[in-house]
Swiss-Prot record:
This is Probable transcriptional regulatory protein GSU1074. GO terms for cellular component: cytosol. SUPFAM superfamilies: YebC-like. It comes from Geobacter sulfurreducens (strain ATCC 51573 / DSM 12127 / PCA). One of its GO terms (biological process) is regulation of DNA-templated transcription. Pfam families: TACO1_YebC_N, Transcrip_reg. It is found in: Cytoplasm.
Amino acid sequence: MSGHNKWSTIRHKKGAADAKRGKVFTKLIKEITVAAKIGGGDPNGNPRLRAAVDKAKAENMPKDNIERAIKKGTGELEGVSYEEIIYEGYGPGGVAVLVECMTDNRNRTVGEVRSTFTKCNGNMGEAGCVSWMFDKKGLIVLSKDVDFEKLFETALEAGADDVADEEEQYEVLTDPAAFIDVREALEKAGFPFESAEITMIPQTMVKLDGKNAENMLKLMDRLEDNDDVQNVYANFDISTEEMEKLM
């Protein structure tokens, strides 16, 4: 499996997705609020907001929650002002880690993120220390129930960079600027998505096993458990055999 989707699969197998549903809602509400603040409250004219709303709907977030978050972003309702920050660092075994945060208290967040790195045998670095190891891409994940040839043809005609046949799924990669066009073309052709988002794809992977693998999973878990953390990207690769030992 490609590394950029490895963690979401691991997390799902660990059963963490449902256990952290409340935190997922909190993070999505923040993203919707900030997206509406920056680009306006109309999802049709605001690609970032549309992506956030689509993700919220996929998580079965109530419509009222979504609408309130948009109104807080546009100023129609009073809400907290969030600041977007990206922290960078190294996990066990030299794994590159990007941590995207939204916070109303920068000092609190940086202290908590730094402490989490340290407790899991990693260390926080300076801005720019690992971001060059990742490429910003659109990623659309589909189940293997769909027709690959039709998917490949439709995606590339719409402007996708690549369509990959991975172990458990198909993955469509796009330039961020082409993401909406490709997603809409696939929707129009009737392809159901498992997920569709703008993400950070690592250029190279670091293979982990033993204690380093165990500590890396702890680091990912604890970072994502922080309410101020929106997304965590890392370039680690753990074999299926190693995962079975850890789980």
